[in-house]
Amino acid sequence: MLEHGVMKIPGINNVGKTGQAGGETERIPSTEPLGSSAATSPAGPLGGLPARSSSISNTNRTGENPMITPIISSNLGLKHRVTLRKATLASLMQSLSGESSNRVMWNDRYDTLLIARDPREIKNAIEKSVTDFGGLENYKELTGGADPFALMTPVCGLSANNIFKLMTEKDVPIDPTSIEYLENTSFAEHVNTLDSHKNYVVIVNDGRLGHKFLIDLPALTQGPRTAYIIQSDLGGGALPAVRVEDWISRRGSDPVSLDELNQLLSKDFSKMPDDVQTRLLASILQIDKDPHKVDIKKLHLDGKLRFASHEYDFRQFQRNAQYVAGLG
């Protein structure tokens, strides 16, 4: 079926106009959240964390994944919390080179818990779709050459949606494409309403950039609140391409200025001089912080800016990440 000009293939992640898997076309400003469609692939049963199987790779005899830092009390010092956050994200990214972890993490079934996704069922759905299309060659021809069995490098919407789910879900599925986005609301004023003693993640759908990304706002322990960006980018717009693994490795634990974020996500951004716009984009969203790699001529300053925030429990985030990393 066609959705926003993209062929949707039941049961698996889909391929956008760019030829990238994920069913999303980047760099097209829209009033709808990127990745607004949910696939119809089957998923495992809903519920809490599934029992760990001895067949799951990367686990020790306790059933815990040794790559993940042990889950401990949330009453942590700032330095320790920063270290735990960095280790959790690094272990998650490392696991995505594994077939099962990759398929579970970058699936577009948003109506079930991410930790209820079953990699075997996802693979079976892929195989069925390939068969329905008359074989692998026919499938590739109809989807722009995409290999459905290859490890996925997610476009911005797919990575933002799924990491948002991973961070926020506990007992109830959260669909990032169905949540209420704030529009015509000051980002700076909204952040000021958030409880500084709680963790929040903000999902940003920026039509000016044709881009979707996350802002992680860990609980404040002392001093000014810290913000971190989590993103992938297909490229072709104002910013160059970047894989989510590379971003997490190099800048995922690099705090960004809330003052700069407030400027970037303000209505006044479109009125700022070109050099200021370039500097802000490079500082916040360019992996090298290099203004020469920002092309502001590709901005769509009349595009809509929308965002939504959600509280998360860091220990639950660790558990969810541990599930994905333990799949291998």
From Swiss-Prot:
<feature type="active site">
    <location>
        <position position="156"/>
    </location>
</feature>
<feature type="region of interest" description="Disordered">
    <location>
        <begin position="1"/>
        <end position="68"/>
    </location>
</feature>
<dbReference type="GO" id="GO:0050568">
    <property type="term" value="F:protein-glutamine glutaminase activity"/>
</dbReference>
<feature type="active site">
    <location>
        <position position="211"/>
    </location>
</feature>
<keyword id="KW-0800">Toxin</keyword>
<dbReference type="GO" id="GO:0090729">
    <property type="term" value="F:toxin activity"/>
</dbReference>
<protein>
    <recommendedName>
        <fullName>Protein-glutamine deamidase Cif</fullName>
        <ecNumber>3.5.1.44</ecNumber>
    </recommendedName>
</protein>
<keyword id="KW-0378">Hydrolase</keyword>
<dbReference type="GO" id="GO:0042025">
    <property type="term" value="C:host cell nucleus"/>
</dbReference>
<dbReference type="GO" id="GO:0085034">
    <property type="term" value="P:symbiont-mediated suppression of host NF-kappaB cascade"/>
</dbReference>
<dbReference type="Pfam" id="PF16374">
    <property type="entry name" value="CIF"/>
</dbReference>
<dbReference type="GO" id="GO:0044071">
    <property type="term" value="P:symbiont-mediated perturbation of host cell cycle progression"/>
</dbReference>
<feature type="compositionally biased region" description="Polar residues">
    <location>
        <begin position="52"/>
        <end position="63"/>
    </location>
</feature>
<dbReference type="GO" id="GO:0005576">
    <property type="term" value="C:extracellular region"/>
</dbReference>
<keyword id="KW-0964">Secreted</keyword>
<dbReference type="InterPro" id="IPR032278">
    <property type="entry name" value="Cif"/>
</dbReference>
<keyword id="KW-1048">Host nucleus</keyword>
<comment type="function">
    <text>Protein-glutamine deamidase effector that inhibits the host cell cycle and other key cellular processes such as the actin network and programmed-cell death. Acts by mediating the side chain deamidation of 'Gln-40' of host NEDD8, converting it to glutamate, thereby abolishing the activity of cullin-RING-based E3 ubiquitin-protein ligase complexes (CRL complexes). Inactivation of CRL complexes prevents ubiquitination and subsequent degradation of the cyclin-dependent kinase inhibitors CDKN1A/p21 and CDKN1B/p27, leading to G1 and G2 cell cycle arrests in host cells.</text>
</comment>
<comment type="similarity">
    <text>Belongs to the Cif family.</text>
</comment>
<keyword id="KW-0843">Virulence</keyword>
<feature type="active site">
    <location>
        <position position="231"/>
    </location>
</feature>
